[in-house]
Amino acid sequence: MKILIPTAKEMNTDLPSIETTLLRSESQAVLDALALYSASQLESFYKVSAEKAAEECQNIQALKRQTAQHYPALKLFDGLMYRHIKRDKLTEVEQAYLENHVFITSALYGVVPALSPMAPHRLDFLMKLKVAGKTLKSHWKAAYDEAVKQEEVIFSLLSSEFETVFSKEIRAKMVTFKFMEDRGGQLKIHSTISKKARGAFLTALIENQVQTVGEARRLNFAGFVYREDLSQPQGLVFVKEV
């Protein structure tokens, strides 16, 4: 089984760097397309300040020159979901589960094990980058499918922008998760709740060595419990009373 999680915009490079490997051909093609942009073009491409665009330009050129520092992806990304994932002081069993089952979906690196080396970069599937005339989603679709086609169980903690990179056949196999708060009988869902809960849920999967949908249903984490009345066979809903 594989658990798929998205990348994040926020990154923390205050970490020990690690050795890297050569970029796969699909990644190199994306990098080559990005490297054609000047700092001022990146400003409008990323919709960021000139200062931020200059920083991103340096990151891209460092990757291109193979001088970029690399870090374990799960620790490099530092968005809200990531900050709620157990990333340190894992037992041997938890570490093995993480290495075998948790994969990050990236618009630059593809579908890779969570502790794979990644360099700081900014790219997601909403960005209108063309790679050899194709959209990012079209460019990656075959490789994304290939990464999970043998799996019987695929847990998706992805947003739709990442899920829709996969073919319909693969998406039909995915088990998805929704996290809601019950405020006096009113069910609420918003991105902050979802991001925190996804991190806490992944931590519960790791700590409990979950391998099946049935085991996932039995989890109780960060105040969230499974709600059968709101769920579908492949769409599990967890609710926290506040």
Curated annotation (Swiss-Prot):
One of its GO terms (cellular component) is cytosol. GO terms for biological process: response to hydroperoxide. It comes from the Bacteria. Pfam families: H2O2_YaaD. Disulfide bonds: none annotated. InterPro entries: YaaA (IPR005583). NCBIfam families: PRK02101.1-4. Belongs to the UPF0246 family. This is UPF0246 protein SPN23F15130. It comes from Streptococcus pneumoniae (strain ATCC 700669 / Spain 23F-1).
